[in-house]
Amino acid sequence: MIKVDKQLRCKRCYSWIEEDWQLPGGQYYCRACIVFGRNQEGKELYYFPSKTSEIEFPVLKWFGELTPYQAEISEKLLRTYQKQKDSLVHAVTGAGKTEMIYNIVAYVLENKGHVAIASPRVDVCRELFLRMKRDFTCSISLLHAEGEPYDGSPLVIATTHQLLKFYQSFDLVIVDEVDAYPFVGNVMLNHAVEQAKTETGRFIYLTATSTLSLEEQVRLGTLEKHHLARRFHGNPLVLPKFFWQGRLQKSLTRGKLPRPLLY
């Protein structure tokens, strides 16, 4: 526990401690993250530094080919990481965001780093695990409420809640579906992601629908934005067209569609 402005705050999940969160002996404890073990007043939290893992070279065994648009984003992610900056990939659903992070993930792993790919949604984590297991040679841990314990793997795929278990462990933290519930606007989960990164580590945020908070970081220059408005097939998005049809009901009654709908 730490005291901020005369109020206790949980050092693990950063939640404010309510007045009635007390044990029979009077000590305060945190109910917000109790599923990970009771953190109470007067007790210390300990962590173990990440160990360097032996990996095969090359760590990436994916033989697919990126489109020119995807390859451009992939290269920008690598350059941005090397410049010690965080990235936002704002790409439409179906653009191939997973494949675009492969090179940067491989780069960090081959330089003896640790990578976490987190999502608020467990179904996304399970899908990512299967794809990464197929395309990478290193050991990979899948962490969620019903998953196995962490085994020291250099590549971790986890729900954002599970990152509460880590402290300054990852050289790269990638958050997929960063706009999704319950992550967006959740102080505890955002704190979990922040504390899981090493002091020199970087973030990559993936989204199809950016948020005002992320766009503000882009405007301030603390986040570098990479935008892709094309799906993997390379065709531009189909944009809706507006037209006024004042006799729609009459046309439908006669069993006919208005002419603009036929083209």
Task: Show where each model-derived region lies.
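Interdomain "pre-motor" coupling segment immediately N-terminal to P-loop NTPase/helicase cores
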Residues: I2-T52
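N-terminal pre-P-loop "Q-motif" helix
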Residues: W62-K85
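Walker A/P-loop
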Residues: Q82-A106
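Conserved catalytic network of the ASCE P-loop NTPase/AAA+ motor domain
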Residues: Y107-E110, E148-Y150, K165-Q168, Q195-T200, ...
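Conserved RecA-like ASCE P-loop NTPase motor core of nucleic-acid helicases/translocases
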Residues: G113-R121, L262-Y263
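Residues immediately C-terminal
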Residues: R121-V124, P149, A180-Y181, T211
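Inter-Walker segment of RecA-like/P-loop motor cores
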Residues: R131-F166
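Post-DEXD/H (motif II) to motif III coupling segment of the RecA-like Helicase ATP-binding lobe
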Residues: F170-R259
